């Protein structure tokens, strides 16, 4: 077991190193400098490049970048916030990001379970193919495309929700991102719940519970749904 864990850790570390190297080289191959948008004179750009160490050899800068990153020092921002630590920038935006991520997962899980359960219970009706189509579209359409559609129709055309984040109206501001990010999780969970629920509903103990006179809703909620969600958990 230890050998397997060590092997996986080494593979993960090597993969992460390769990704960091590729991203660094791609940034290096991009034309211009981070200061091109400032409309500065060449002499001023040269001074700034020397100040931030951008005039050093590529290998030197990569080694410095790698060692600083391992220490948690990501340098300073050249564009977004002048001379502000990137660590501080990430810290300022992390609470909103984690809130959106958690709410997206919650929405996707709850809605996915509801849709999957309905599709399984009414799998002989038109509701089943409708849920299947929704799941297929949720997996086929990237979340950013869905986000653009929400921004255009819900925010721009209907004016129901803001497009940009507003700290004074943070709750309404994160509704669109949460909906857009929840589509993939919702689709996968709905399809998984449907499959498990159909299998559980055909079990002997479910048929026995129904034959004892229990209401179908009670059987589904207390027996079928609980057991079908065990693999999901």
Name these PLM-found stretches.
Residues 9-26, 102, 106-114, 118, ...:
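Generic alpha-helical transmembrane segments of integral inner-membrane proteins
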Residues 16-63, 79-81, 158-176:
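Hydrophobic alpha-helical transmembrane segments of membrane transport/permease proteins
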Residues 28, 37, 117-121, 152, ...:
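Transmembrane helix-loop junction
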């Amino acid at each position: 077991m230890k050998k397997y864990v060590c092997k996986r850790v080494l593979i993960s570390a090597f993969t992460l190193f390769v990704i960091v190297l590729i991203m660094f080289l791609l940034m290096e191959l991009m034309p211009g400098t981070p200061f091109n948008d400032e409309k500065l004179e060449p002499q001023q750009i040269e001074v700034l490049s020397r100040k931030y160490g951008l005039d050093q050899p590529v290998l030197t800068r990569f080694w410095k970048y790698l060692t600083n990153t391992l220490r948690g020092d990501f340098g300073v921002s050249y564009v977004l916030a002048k001379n502000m630590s990137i660590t501080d920038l990430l810290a300022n935006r992390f609470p909103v990001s984690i809130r959106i991520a958690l709410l997206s997962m919650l929405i996707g899980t709850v809605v996915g379970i509801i849709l999957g359960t309905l599709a399984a219970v009414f799998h002989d009706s038109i509701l089943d193919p409708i849920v299947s189509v929704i799941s297929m579209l949720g997996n086929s359409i990237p979340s950013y495309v869905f986000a653009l559609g929400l921004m255009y129709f819900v925010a721009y055309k209907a004016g129901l929700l803001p497009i940009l984040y507003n700290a004074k109206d943070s709750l309404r501001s994160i509704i669109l991102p949460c909906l857009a990010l929840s589509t993939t999780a919702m689709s996968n969970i709905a399809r998984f719940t449907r499959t498990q629920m159909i299998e559980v509903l055909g079990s002997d103990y479910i048929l026995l519970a129904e034959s004892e006179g229990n209401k179908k809703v009670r059987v589904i909620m207390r027996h079928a749904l609980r057991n079908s969600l065990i693999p999901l958990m």
